[in-house]
Amino acid sequence: MTTLSPENSLSARRSATFILEKRNPPIDKAEWDSFFDENGHLAKSRDFICINILERGLHPFVRTEAWKFLTGYYSWQSSRDERLMVDSNRRRNYNSLCQMYEKIQPLLENLHGNFTETRNNIAYDIQRLYDKDPLGNVLIDKKKLEKTLLLSYVCNTKAEYQRGFHEMVMLFQLMVEHDHETFWLFQFFLQKTEHSCVINIGVGKNLDMLNSLITLLDPEFAEHLKGKGSGAVQSLFPWFCLCFQRAFKTFDDVWRLWEVLLTGKPCRNFQVLVAYSMLQMVREQALLECMSGDAILMACNNLIDLDADELISAACVVYSELMQKEVPQPLKEFLL
């Protein structure tokens, strides 16, 4: 076991306070532009920018460009001219992938049963997706969404299509203007978050680390979850598969959490601390009523309309507490 840095503990607690008190507004276009020199090179440190995003968030007018840096679509070391070239190359590569897909689609249909099944699943999921805002205006182009999901499935050997990806990609489509941006940002998001939302890659690891975290920080609750409440934690996989998308009030809240995950602040795999913070919301009721695993799961599923800033702040406090503990090596390596 290892004790983690007390400086990190103080920093995380300070961030939690800043988030809740909203001491400074989200980073707007003028401030974002001030982070770069006349050639478009970074004039502030990447660390400085990421901490500010954690503590303050991004104005919607800045989000698209900032996410290109956060995901790795753009290099933090690039100039403005280099980014124009990168964007042009990404567009060209996307078009090449689309052409390739058109050519091999008949082959996939004839030789790969999984392709037909996946295409049907995507079509079914998209058909059920509500695509209008409260005023009845159409938000997204379902045909383009289907195309992005199919192309992602064919091209991504690590992350096969899973239920819920259609909702995630929809948020990328709402954020950006062009199809190639939607496609690449989603691919880079999966990579940057270490495929933590992919059920056959990162979700199981998240659940194991969540169990370790509960055992370390809340032994009483851990005992209940091993006894009468058994099975509850392992059933929380939809939280990770959807990156908590269904827990929030608005799309802005979802984007707010996701961009924090992309910063790597205050630690890697922050999503597990977020899940722990959500579990703490039902802890008292679970222990008081001696709830079963199914009842705990139902209570967790009823956690909706959450405020992203409040949840991020709570998870920062958890990280601060964790820094003062003797942390098992696997958990330490997972978070650092």
Curated annotation (Swiss-Prot):
GO terms for biological process: flagellated sperm motility; sperm axoneme assembly; sperm mitochondrial sheath assembly; spermatogenesis. It comes from the Eukaryota. Disruption phenotype: Male mice are sterile, characterized by defects in sperm tail structure and diminished sperm motility. The mitochondria of the sperm-tail has an abnormal irregular arrangement, abnormal diameter, and structural defects and the axoneme structure of sperm tails is severely disturbed. Sperm mitochondria cannot form a proper mitochondrial sheath at the subsequent mitochondrial compaction step, although they can coil around the flagellum. Expressed in testis, specifically in elongating and elongated spermatids (at protein level). Expressed in the sperm midpiece (at protein level). One of its GO terms (molecular function) is actin binding. It is found in: Cytoplasmic vesicle, Secretory vesicle, Acrosome; Cytoplasm, Cytoskeleton. Acts as a GTPase-activating protein for Rab family protein (s). Essential for the establishment of male fertility, and is required for both the production of normal sperm number and sperm function. Plays an important role in the formation of intact mitochondria, outer dense fibers and axoneme within the sperm tail. Essential for sperm mitochondrial sheath formation and for the interactions of ARMC12 with VDAC2 and VDAC3. May be involved in acrosome formation and cytoskeletal reorganization during spermiogenesis, possibly by regulating RAB3A activity. This is TBC1 domain family member 21. It comes from Mus musculus.
